[in-house]
Curated annotation (Swiss-Prot):
It is found in: Membrane. Residues 1-21, 94-98, 161-179, 225-335 are cytoplasmic. The keyword Lipid metabolism applies. It comes from Trypanosoma cruzi (strain CL Brener). This is Phosphatidylinositol:ceramide inositolphosphotransferase. One of its GO terms (molecular function) is sphingomyelin synthase activity.
Length: 335
């Protein structure tokens, strides 16, 4: 008997389609959050009346205002490393599929080897190399848009007193539309917003980069794990020391992001079918049908069928298109 899941009758979207459409869904969640920030900025308690909340992190680490810029630098480096991991996973995928190595810098082999060289740590992570770059990308953006939507609700519900930073003298938003656009374009760094404390948006981005480098970066090189941990710790210190967020903002954000990312497990189908329903009806932004892909070679798939008398029959077939019937048992235990 073959177990049939609720998604077995659904046509799952190609990974490349998911990779593009979930980016657009993230932008939509940023737009919703930008509107929510207008509300939080207006509802924030008057700093002249309500002082910052007691915080052990503030008591342990002295205030160093300029460290707010160091936080941005750390986030930039972490994001760059995450992009590097995804690109190197793509090169590893190509090697695993038996495709030729990319050699765009034939005139300078050293540069070509550094940029387009294949990295493989040899670590047995239980994650297949095939399409790992697309799946990592999809997990990143699906987690990001879910957490930001949740944050848009949370920051509106309860207004916390401003921390001891520039929000003690908050700027007034004179042009809400412009502020929303600046939030969307700069992901918040170029817009006016105070009061969006519970929970930290900076920490969402930082934690996602940590997860990508811890889980997928370790498939490429051992250095990604210690490097990302050091950058994350430095980022958290900078956020607290610059008084950008309360310590609880960081702890709650870290927990929510990690939990969401781990729930959205690594799957050869990409995002869970429930999330694919959000983008499966779109008439634009890449086809809903799997097309012939030069990065794919025919593979043998073993299908185990339970017969009435307890015997087992194993059939092999060549498949150019992946379909999943029932739960993907091989994914249990993967990060």
């Amino acid at each position: 008997m073959v177990l049939m899941g609720p998604h077995s009758a659904l046509r799952l979207l190609p990974l490349k389609t998911q990779a593009i459409r979930f980016v657009l869904l993230l932008l939509l969640s940023v737009l919703i959050l930008a509107v929510a920030l207008l509300v939080t900025n207006a509802r924030m308690p008057d700093p002249k009346v309500v002082r910052p909340l007691p915080d052990i992190g503030f008591e342990v680490f002295p205030k160093v205002g300029w460290l707010e810029h160091l936080t941005d630098v750390c986030i930039f480096i972490l994001n760059f490393l995450s992009l590097l991991v995804v690109f190197k996973l793509y090169l590893l995928h190509r090697q695993n599929e038996g495709l030729d190595e990319l050699q765009p810098f034939s005139c300078c082999p050293l540069i070509g080897k550094i940029i387009f060289g294949v990295w493989d740590s040899g670590r047995q992570s239980g994650i297949e190399k095939r399409d790992a770059h697309l799946i990592a990308w999809i997990r990143y953006f699906t987690t990001y848009f879910i957490v930001l939507l949740f944050r848009a609700i949370v920051v509106v519900m309860t207004s916390y007193p401003a921390t001891d930073n520039h929000c003690q003298n908050p700027m007034k938003i004179t042009n809400p539309v412009k502020n929303v656009i600046m939030t969307l374009v700069t992901f918040g760094s170029g817009s006016i917003h105070c009061g969006d404390l519970m929970f930290s948006g900076h920490t969402v981005s930082i934690t996602l980069s940590l997860l990508v480098q811890w889980i997928y970066g370790s498939m490429l090189h051992w250095v990604f794990r210690p490097a990302s941990v050091l950058l994350v710790l430095l980022s958290f210190y900078s956020i607290i020391a610059s008084r950008s967020h309360y310590t609880d903002d960081i702890l709650v954000s870290f927990y929510i992001t990690v939990t969401t990312f781990l729930v959205l497990r690594h799957s050869p189908d990409g995002a869970p079918w429930q999330l694919q329903l959000l983008i499966g009806w779109w008439p634009c932004c890449v086809s809903n049908e799997e097309t012939e892909d030069s990065d794919r070679n025919p593979t043998f798939v073993a299908v185990e069928v339970f017969l009435p008398h307890g015997d087992y029959q194993c059939a092999e077939r060549i498949s150019e298109e992946k379909t999943t019937v029932g739960p993907a048992c091989g994914n249990f235990g993967h990060w």
